[in-house]
Every structure is written in C-alpha cells, then in structure tokens.
C-alpha cells in the first residue's frame, strides 16, 4: 500500500521486483503468525501492438499478425518476469525458515482477444493456481473459484475463524451453497 515504486513496465504498471523486500518487511513486523496478501500487477495490459521491448528474453513466433505478435511477446515477457519474482520470493521465504504457505493465482486471463475455442480447457474464465508450502501439505488438484481459494487453504491449515471462511468451508459442497 505504501511501497515506493521506482520501476514500472513500459505500460506503466509497477514491476514485481519491489514485492519481495516489501513482503519480507511485512513478515518482519511481528513475531507471531502473519497473513500477507500481495497483488502483482506487472502482467496487466492493454498489451502494445507495436514493438515495445528492446531485447526481449522470449521471442514469440507463429503469429502472423504483427500487432498480435507484439502484444503476445510483451505479455509473455512480463509473465516471465513475474515467474522470476515467484522464484525470488520462494528463495527468500526458504531462508526465513518459518512454516509458510504461498498461494499464487490469477483472477483473469490476459485481455488478448482470447475466445473459449482458443483454450485447451475451453473455459475462458478459469485460471490456474499454485500452492507452495514448506510444511508438507498434501498435493491436492482440483477446480476452485478465486473467491473460495483462501477458505480452502485455511481449511487445510485447520483455521476455521471468520464468518465468510466458515461459510465457504462448511457450505461449499451443499446443494444451496450459492443460491
């Protein structure tokens, strides 16, 4: 909320390199258990249809339309930078030696004119999520809505406080859950 943003993407979004030190600072402010919610914006669009990156690490091929190719190249390079952030965050967390669960998910796909037919899973509004931990949680695959993910993680951690979390944890598998 009060980060000193020094670096932005060519489209004006804050880059993720600012996040690791700020997350570590947040974790250092208390001696006890922490809950930190961080939102990355580096990969957000609109994605430029003109060449924007001087020396991209990843070159997109196979897209005939030059504007679309430029937009995809910009997007995949920003996601590549976001992947680096994830690796840096995990390294920093591992060095702390504290029991930790990290949840990574996207709340939407990129605004690149995608249609359901373009996607392997055919679901335009689904995104993947990854849970990383150093406490031995059992891997559990499945589909879950973004608004349910924290209730699911807290349930797996045996945390059952909070009205909304309790509702999602207790009612998710019932007939009238979202009625």
Predicted regions and their residues:
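Solvent-exposed soluble domains appended to multi-pass membrane proteins
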Residues: 1-179
């Amino acid at each position: 909320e009060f980060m000193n943003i020094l670096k932005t993407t060519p489209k004006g979004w804050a880059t993720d390199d600012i996040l690791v030190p700020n997350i570590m600072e947040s974790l250092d402010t208390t001696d006890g258990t922490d809950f930190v919610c961080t939102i990355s914006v580096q990969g957000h669009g609109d994605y430029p249809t003109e060449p924007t990156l001087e020396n991209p690490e990843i070159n997109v091929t196979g897209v005939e339309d030059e504007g679309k190719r430029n937009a995809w190249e910009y997007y995949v390079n920003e996601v590549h930078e976001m992947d680096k952030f994830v690796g840096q965050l995990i390294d920093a967390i591992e060095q702390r030696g504290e029991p930790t669960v990290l949840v990574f998910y996207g709340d939407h796909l990129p605004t690149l004119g995608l249609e359901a037919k373009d996607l392997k899973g055919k679901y335009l509004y689904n995104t993947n999520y990854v849970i990383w931990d150093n406490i031995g949680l059992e891997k559990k695959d499945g589909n879950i809505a973004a608004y349910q993910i924290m209730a699911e993680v807290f349930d797996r951690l045996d945390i059952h406080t909070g009205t909304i979390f309790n509702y999602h944890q207790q009612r998710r598998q019932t007939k009238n859950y979202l009625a």
